[in-house]
Amino acid sequence: MINTNDFKTGQTIKFNNQIYQILEFLHVKPGKGAAFVRTKLRNLRTGSVIDYTFNAGIKVQPALITKIKMQFLYALEDNYIFMNTQNYEQLEINKHQLKDFLKYLYEGLLVDIIFYENDEIVGITLPDKISIKVAYTEPGAKGDTKTNSLKDAALETGLVIKVPLFINIGEKIIINTETGLYLSRDNNK
């Protein structure tokens, strides 16, 4: 059991028959009355975020979460196939479980699959930045590097983002997976 006084950001708990990750917490000791802990929790099954206040000193059950590094191989109808990089076992995940992550998945991408009690898939963690190929964008003209203008670019996954005017079809760019924003050109090609 975890005491609410020992909460840490990123910790996972089982509470009200759900699995939550602690995003934020704040210990509050008012002048009058008992101390309490304000938290912001993300439900790992649904992705929803809630605010909840615990009485200080109560105990909650920890959630056994395991992260396994896997490589995305390919999509097959409504399922996405991943391979464990340690033992080469393959795992099928339905597209509904992947939610907002589909727009970043391309063949060969390494991700962390999050399991609850080693059998239930509750999430996926993408790298903070990924290098991805531009499938289509309007061609840039000479001198386009002098302004901070942006244009639309369709990536190989189908995601459309804003990129600088000097980016061309076939180039690899680095994007932030949290915000979906262009960061830089990928010079490693």
UniProtKB/Swiss-Prot annotation:
Which pathway does it operate in? Protein biosynthesis; polypeptide chain elongation
**Functional note:** Involved in peptide bond synthesis. Stimulates efficient translation and peptide-bond synthesis on native or reconstituted 70S ribosomes in vitro. Probably functions indirectly by altering the affinity of the ribosome for aminoacyl-tRNA, thus increasing their reactivity as acceptors for peptidyl transferase.
One Pfam family this sequence matches: Elong-fact-P_C
Tell me the superkingdom of the source: Bacteria
Keyword annotations for this protein, in alphabetical order, are: Cytoplasm, Elongation factor, Protein biosynthesis
Instruction: Please verify whether the record's keywords include Cytoplasm.
Output: yes
The keyword Transmembrane is annotated on this UniProt entry: no
Output one GO BP term: peptide biosynthetic process
Q: Cellular component terms, GO, for this chain's entry?
A: cytoplasm
Single GO MF annotation: translation elongation factor activity
From the Swiss-Prot or TrEMBL record, state where the protein is found. Cytoplasm
**Similarity comment text for this entry:** Belongs to the elongation factor P family.
Q: In which organism is this protein found?
A: Onion yellows phytoplasma (strain OY-M)
Q: Which InterPro entries match?
A: Elong-fact-P_C, NA-bd_OB-fold, Rib_uL2_dom2, Transl_elong_fac_P/YeiP, Transl_elong_KOW-like, Transl_elong_P/YeiP_cen, Transl_elong_P/YeiP_CS, Transl_elongation_fac_P
Name the UniProt record assigns to this protein: Elongation factor P
